[in-house]
Amino acid sequence: MKVLVTGATSGLGRNAVEYLRNKGISVRATGRNEAMGKLLSKMGAEFIPADLTELVSSQAKVMLAGIDTLWHCSSFTSPWGTQQAFDLANVRATRRLGEWSVAWGVRNFVHISSPSLYFDYHHHRDIQEDFRPHRFANEFARSKAASEEVINLLAQANPHTRFTILRPQSLFGPHDKVFIPRMVQMMRHYGSVLLPRGGNALVDMTYYENAVHAMWLASQPQCDHLPSARAWNISNGEPRTLRSIVQKLIDELGIKCRIRSVPYPMLDIIARSMEHFGNKSAKEPAFTHYGVSKLNFDFTLDISRAQQELGYQPIVTLDEGVTRTAAWLKDHGKLHD
């Protein structure tokens, strides 16, 4: 087995490389951060620096040579960006990579999507894979849904490659650059965390290692009989109030900080104002309408399909995941400017 991991220099992809190397699996990794690429090489991975939005066929040929399984973790995940940027990174890059994978004989293509395509500014619990909102919440969600359509079309036309879609909810852990780092920044700079409804939203999260474990299961021969392009929700399977998760992080980090309850409408007005000025400056604001709303609404997934069909069970609990993440942040100096 030889696995190509895209988006390997941060987040899920970075954790995926470590997971595979710990199993002794041959790994080829690609990403844009060449400094991190050197660290991946020291772990025993073969690193090829590349920007998938600019990849040409000659580069793809080298990247995919000898690969039988591809874990496509690369994605533009910001809540702030243009339609063109999301389409280029999440739709076009996925289509071209999928086409090249088929051409060069990749047997398994695991595509990392997002439950954001379910989000519609309403409370939802135990969301199943076939749920769709009346309209997508933002360009990111729309682009991830479009990337899944690309995967579906590729699967229909190419039966010799099995495509898998995984939708992990609220990923966190070592090498995270999104949710936890932003929370920590707020804790450090303001000494408080502002949460709508006091953090009473019931949410699901996914520790990176659990998501990678699901990717591993989906790549095994026992899953070959499953329909190509089938989608599975992935989470820790431990819905908690957002407040309890944030408080656990505060306690583990030992930061002097308190959680402040702010009315959702007030926080949303602030976020919309920041978005207005952000549009003028082209800079991502500290708060966005989408980001604030994700903190306000109940949002949990039904993972029974993954449990029954992939044999998925989380291997790291939510509490242990937060403890490990806090330890990693402290060990790597992420609590200082």
Curated annotation (Swiss-Prot):
Function statement: Catalyzes the degradation of estradiol into estrone. Can also degrade testosterone.
The enzyme's E.C. designation: 1.1.1.51
Domain of life: Bacteria
Annotated GO MF terms: oxidoreductase activity
Biological processes annotated in GO: lipid metabolic process
Primary enzyme class: oxidoreductase
Catalytic activity: 17beta-estradiol + NAD(+) = estrone + NADH + H(+); 17beta-estradiol + NADP(+) = estrone + NADPH + H(+); testosterone + NAD(+) = androst-4-ene-3,17-dione + NADH + H(+); testosterone + NADP(+) = androst-4-ene-3,17-dione + NADPH + H(+)
InterPro entries: Epimerase_deHydtase (IPR001509), Lipid_A_modif_metabolic_enz (IPR050177), NAD(P)-bd_dom_sf (IPR036291)
Record protein name field: 3-beta-hydroxysteroid dehydrogenase
